[in-house]
UniProtKB/Swiss-Prot annotation:
Keywords: ATP-binding, Cell cycle, Coiled coil, Kinase, Magnesium, Manganese, Metal-binding, Nucleotide-binding, Nucleus, Phosphoprotein, Serine/threonine-protein kinase, Transferase. The keyword Phosphoprotein applies. It comes from Macaca fascicularis (Crab-eating macaque). The modification Phosphoserine is found at residue 273. Residues 29-287 form the Protein kinase domain. It comes from the Eukaryota. This is Serine/threonine-protein kinase Nek11. CDD domains: STKc_Nek11 (cd08222). GO terms for cellular component: nucleolus. One of its GO terms (molecular function) is protein serine kinase activity. ATP binds at residues 35-43, 61. Its main location: nucleus. PANTHER family: CAMK FAMILY PROTEIN KINASE, NIMA-RELATED KINASE 11. Phosphorylated by NEK2. Phosphorylation at Ser-273 is important for its activation.
Amino acid sequence: MLKFQEAAKCVSGSTAISTYPKTLIARRYVLQQKLGSGSFGTVYLVSDKKAKRGEELKVLKEISVGELNPNETVQANLEAQLLSKLDHPAIVKFHASFVEQDNFCIITEYCEGRDLDYKIQEYKEAGKIFPDNQIIEWFIQLLLGVDYMHERRILHRDLKSKNIFLKNNLLKIGDFGVSRLLMGSCDLATTLTGTPHYMSPEALKHQGYDTKSDIWSLACILYEMCCMNHAFAGSNFLSIVLKIVEGDTPSLPERYPKELNTIMESMLNKNPSLRPSAIEILKIPYIDEQLQHLMCRHSEMTLEDKNLDCQKEAARLINAMQKRIHLQTLRALSEVQKMTPRERMRLRKLQAADERARKLKKIVEEKYEENSKRMQELRSRNFQQLSVDVLHEKTHLIGMEEKEEQPEGRPSCSPQDEDEERWQDREEEFDEPTLENLSEPQPIPSMDLRKLESIVEDATSDLGYHEIPEDPLVAEEYYADAFDSYCEESDEEEEEIVLAGPEKEIKNEGSQPTYRTNQQDSDIEALARCLENVLGCTSLDTKTIPSMAADVSPGPTIFNSVMARTKMKRMRESAMQKLGTEVFEEVYNYLKRARHQNASEAEIRERLEKVVPRASDCFEVDQLLYFEEQLLITMGK
């Protein structure tokens, strides 16, 4: 089962969504399959009927929230609108949310690579580890996403490997805001939704949750990517809490760069004010150098993708044009087949006349180009051989040239021709030796249209068409003779003429090229832009978030006790299914007494191992007791 949420659990309870495939939800989303279940609810893969091509698949999270009060519903919708405006390549896109009966439904972006926890477990079982450069790249992507949220005063509150998803090998932060949407912004809401392995000391001690708490969780994820294990592990819930609050700071193995280990240790500082912010980490020289390498690589990838997309787009346009021509040809063929033999013959002769006109036009254009080129060469040759000093030319010579009369019998010329004659006269007066070597300009031959028409007739004589006789009786006999052979052969000829091209095109219709979706391209391009923005930002003052900044997003401020009880009910049902009802009751009652009596961890472990094979199997029961106690304290206040 896919690990999109908490460890998969079989949860009973009411549901507003049918598990049958192809079910239509909210008149827009078609249910494809169930992806998994978690502590909050069930996750489905759906297809959006109104989405763009290539972006139809989305994820629907169905969360049972009980009967929400009207003010809680309104505030949850306001928070959903805020989350839907977030747009970053390292954050899962939040599309929409709606309430259906006693379920709150959230529509988010679909990531086909599953979550980071699944990827880590897959590598761990295979005995492999992630390459250093891959870890650095993923870590930088997470830093960019966290910095984007913190700039907008939005806290995640539940950063962990199961809430980070892979899409085209890019990490995307997801499932944030769920606690704010459903349980409010109090400390207990964070404790109930958070996973103990990633929770910061101040969150466990109810000293407040701020941006530096997300930084702590991010450091735990970095350690998990490097070591394939949790940074703070233990056999039960309280042992993990003690390690986080009072234990030593873990270190990375020696195979990783010292700079990376130093950064992680600073992020795991138990004093929140001493932890660096996301933008401060991005400005550390070691990370800044890695940023530059990533930006160069992503820029090259973007350029290659654009070139490839241009080629694919050109191929797509060619295929579309060929298909259009094919359809037009089929329509024309159908029109021809509906004609009578006389109409077909007339159409054929009209086509022959059009072809003859096109050839005439082509020959005229060629002759015109030839004459123009020849005139240009003559003008250029005469102009290059002039040796007149225009600046020192005598004014009386110019006056004499202007008064010269035109030769008899010579037609009047345009002003442009007069200028050419002046230059030629100056050549004769000032540079006679040069002009003697010049060949006299040849007159441009006039075009004989009759001769041109005869040439075209000779060129088109191979068509085998003859003029229609003007005499009606002769023409009737002419048509009768022509149609005998035409009716038998014309259909085949028409098919050869009209369908010569489309046959190849029809064969190519079946093999359409696969296109990369716009979303994949935009993620890489957007990530490259984010890297450029971070490298271009030289001042930390403009982006640094105060270490103790409160989460001021317009979210719910009232704690939803119904949602908290629902979560604990699911946790109890899951533990009962794992241990059995009798064993669960025995473990639950014993741990409740042991915690009140402050029994030692060794004593508790020894007693639990007599009831269950492993003491770690009771982790969920221990966590349930802790949550119940915290809930009573909160409700008492």
